[in-house]
Amino acid sequence: MEKKVICQDIFWSCDGTSFVSVHNDFGIRQYLVPEEGNTDKLNRNLLLPFTRFFRNQSIVSCAIDPFYSLYNENSDRLAGDRIVVGGKNFPLQLYSLMDGQCILSYDTMNKINGEYETVYSVKIDVESRVYTGSCRNKVAIYDKSRRDAVWMNQSTKKASKGRQSIISCFEEQPMGGQALSRGSLLCGSYANEMFQVDCRHQRLERLNYTRTVAGGIVQILTSDNGRYVYVVRRNSDAISIYDRRNLQHELNVLRLPFRIHHNSAKLKAYIDTAYGLSMGTPRGTILNWGRDLVEFGGVPSHNSVEDPLITSIPPESEWRTNLDSTIPATVVKNCPGDPELFALSHGGTISLCRFGG
């Protein structure tokens, strides 16, 4: 049986003129956004990639330079058309999006057994640091232009029985917001733990451990003001909300009309500065919780942050996409230059749509 092609993630350029999609067919595709006069007729138009290249093995994790742009003329920075890709039994590698050539391989070899460690999660920050997460809750930090890690550590806490001590994701900040470092970075594990990564310290600090039936943290999203953290878990029908100042206690939850299953069609949530938090569904629609709600953690103005009552908040809106309702809308991300325009993965295809269109 032929394997279905699924989009794993989408990354917009910082200027909104192009975006990149990564798929489970080992392919990385780059798309140009049509001219402004043509974007009002995009609801049913599928896009053809401007460039594409294929690796010879599956892509476990990937990340793009936050300053990625086809029109980057800032000679003071390294070229922005770069993507880092992690796979099994292979070093983490930096590729050019334009020609698909490998530019640099990072040293991810385990010195004890001589094997390359699988990078399960990766992030590039605004200071060109590459963060990697692997098994045994190991985090390493690289300068983007150097192969050797400048910082490396792992948690000494052991995962509970049946849990995986793997760093599964790093904190994601809203595209289109202030591209500024917010100090320490959060990361999550498949053992439902949240850690703080701070290269000024010599160890990972565990900030949260949730005893739940959920199958592990897969995304950590931050509100634009940086005060609230939204945690997406596998095998869960809700997104947990935490106050960043107190990550030990769940503040509220966003209620989902489905359960996030552990399969190849990974549904991703996304926060942007204009529309709040959006997420695709198995039936091809898009759920949305507005910016005002997201920026205040779902806490009504008459409530105290210390109020012990947890509110389960349903979606404020559900948008239809005029596409096949039998195929999940797995990834949806807004254009930073035009928030009403968003790139949508629908199975293995990519399209551009407008909210309300």
From Swiss-Prot:
SUPFAM superfamilies to which the protein is assigned, alphabetical: WD40 repeat-like
Biological processes annotated in GO: mRNA processing; RNA splicing
Family: Belongs to the SWT21 family.
Species whose genome carries this gene: Saccharomyces cerevisiae (strain JAY291)
Keyword Cytoplasm included in the entry's annotation: no
GO cellular component, one term: nucleus
Compartment annotation: Nucleus
Gene3D superfamilies found in the cross-reference section: YVTN repeat-like/Quinoprotein amine dehydrogenase (2.130.10.10)
InterPro entries to which the protein is assigned, alphabetical: SWT21/TCAB1_mRNA_Telomere (IPR051150), WD40/YVTN_repeat-like_dom_sf (IPR015943), WD40_repeat_dom_sf (IPR036322)
Annotated function: Involved in mRNA splicing. Helps to stabilize the U1 snRNP-5' splice site interaction.
Chief subcellular location: nucleus
Leader peptide range in chain numbering: none
Alphabetically ordered keywords of this record: mRNA processing, mRNA splicing, Nucleus
Full protein name: Protein SWT21
Known partners and oligomeric status: Associates with snRNPs.
